Structure formats: C-alpha cells, structure tokens
Amino acid sequence: MPLASDVKQKIMSDYATVERDTGSPEVQVAMLTRRISDLTEHLKVHKHDHHSRRGLLLLVGRRRRLLNYLAKTDINRYRALIERLGLRR
C-alpha cells in the first residue's frame, strides 16, 4: 500500500540531505522502512495474504541493496542511518 503524501513529506523533511531531496539513499531507505513496517503490521492480522508477503520480501531486498550501496560508498552515513532507523546490521 502506498504511503500518504503527508507521511512522505514528513520522511523527506526528516531524512533529506538537501532541500527537496527525494532520491538520496537515506530518504529511499526511510520510506521503504516505513512501508515495510506497515506491511508487517498488515501481515500480523492477515497471515494468509501471500501476495502481500511477496511484496514485503521485495521491499526488504530493495532496502538491503540500498543499504549495501550506502555502506560501500560512505560508511559513516550508513552507520548514522541504521542507528536513526533502529535497524540491526
């Protein structure tokens, strides 16, 4: 399920490196993390929703690839981001 535009704006303003930043890895990972948490809550209620489970796995893979890219290019930004989002690595 897509995020509401006000939620997207809030995430962008919190994680943007410059104003109107939508493409930086930090913003993308933060948005994916929000979608992943929403889908996880949905799947706790609807255990047999396999279509959404596959979508969740795709989102987790996309987030993992972005985090790997960030770790390779700038380890300090990577560490700060996972600390801020509360992700374990």
Swiss-Prot record:
Alphabetical list of SUPFAM superfamilies matching this protein: S15/NS1 RNA-binding domain
Keywords from the UniProt entry: Ribonucleoprotein, Ribosomal protein, RNA-binding, rRNA-binding
SMART domains reported for this sequence: Ribosomal_S15
Keyword Oxidoreductase: no
Pfam short name (any one): Ribosomal_S15
Biological processes, Gene Ontology terms: translation
Entry annotated with the keyword ATP-binding: no
Domain of life from the UniProt record: Bacteria
Coiled-coil ranges from the UniProt annotation: none
One term under GO cellular component: cytosolic small ribosomal subunit
Molecular function, one GO term: structural constituent of ribosome
Record note on quaternary structure: Part of the 30S ribosomal subunit. Forms a bridge to the 50S subunit in the 70S ribosome, contacting the 23S rRNA.
Function as written in the Swiss-Prot or TrEMBL entry: One of the primary rRNA binding proteins, it binds directly to 16S rRNA where it helps nucleate assembly of the platform of the 30S subunit by binding and bridging several RNA helices of the 16S rRNA.
NCBIfam families per record: S15_bact
Family: Belongs to the universal ribosomal protein uS15 family.
Matching HAMAP family: Ribosomal_uS15_B
Name this polypeptide is given: Small ribosomal subunit protein uS15
Organism the protein comes from: Frankia casuarinae (strain DSM 45818 / CECT 9043 / HFP020203 / CcI3)
Gene encoding the protein: rpsO
